[in-house]
Design a protein with these regions (language model features):
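Mobile active-site "lid"/loop adjacent to the S-adenosyl-L-methionine
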Residues: 49-78
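C-terminal catalytic and target-recognition region of SAM-dependent MTase-like enzymes
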Residues: 47, 74, 88-150
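S-adenosyl-L-methionine
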Residues: 8-52, 58
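Helix-to-beta-strand junctions that scaffold the AdoMet/dcAdoMet cofactor pocket
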Residues: 83-85
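Conserved SAM-binding motif I beta-strand of class I
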Residues: 1-6
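Residues at alpha-helix caps and immediate loop-helix transition turns in enzyme cores, especially N-
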Residues: 44, 64, 71, 102-103
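Amphipathic, non-transmembrane alpha-helical secondary structure
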Residues: 37-41, 73, 77-80
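Flexible loop/turn segments at secondary-structure boundaries
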Residues: 10-12, 38-40, 59-61, 97-100, ...
Length: 150
């Protein structure tokens, strides 16, 4: 079963349309228009085998960086705690001012907070169609981690 969670009703309508277009069994999919962190608070631990955490940009300027890193930590701690042993978390950031290193540290802190053993299986970067101009390194804003949760 797939649960799709987003605070945007428009996004959830598009998800539902794509489920229909793809010919997927609608009984095996639930769309929930709710804040992801609020949703995760009520989900039983070990519910999911796989979770994709892909929030909107939490920091659009340097002044928002510390709050963004705390938000990434809270969201990832909630996600890691809801994944069953042997499960996976794909987690992403599209915040330009959040470096790969700072994002990874927020995720590491989240894992430590949960007390779960977590391994990085892969570091994910933006694809080649999001080329980075050498004179604008901040253009390398998409980053992610594939985590294995023991």
């Amino acid at each position: 079963h797939v649960d799709s969670v987003d605070s945007s009703a428009k996004a959830m309508a598009l998800v539902d349309k794509n489920v229909e277009i793809g010919g997927f069994d609608k009984s095996r999919h639930t769309s929930l228009c709710v804040d992801a962190l609020d949703y995760l608070r009520d989900v039983p631990e070990d519910k999911y085998d796989l979770m994709i955490v892909d929030p909107p940009a939490f920091a659009k300027h340097r002044g928002a960086l510390n709050n963004a890193l705390r938000a990434y930590q809270r969201l990832n701690a909630a996600a890691i705690s809801k994944v069953a042993p042997g499960g996976f978390v794909f987690t992403f950031s599209c915040s330009q001012v959040v470096t790969k290193e700072a994002f990874a540290l927020a995720v590491f802190s989240a894992a430590a907070q949960t007390g779960r053993k977590v391994r990085i299986l892969d570091r994910l970067n933006q694809p080649s169609d999001h080329a980075v101009n050498i004179y604008h390194p901040e253009g390398e804003y998409l980053k992610g981690l594939l985590l294995y949760v023991e």
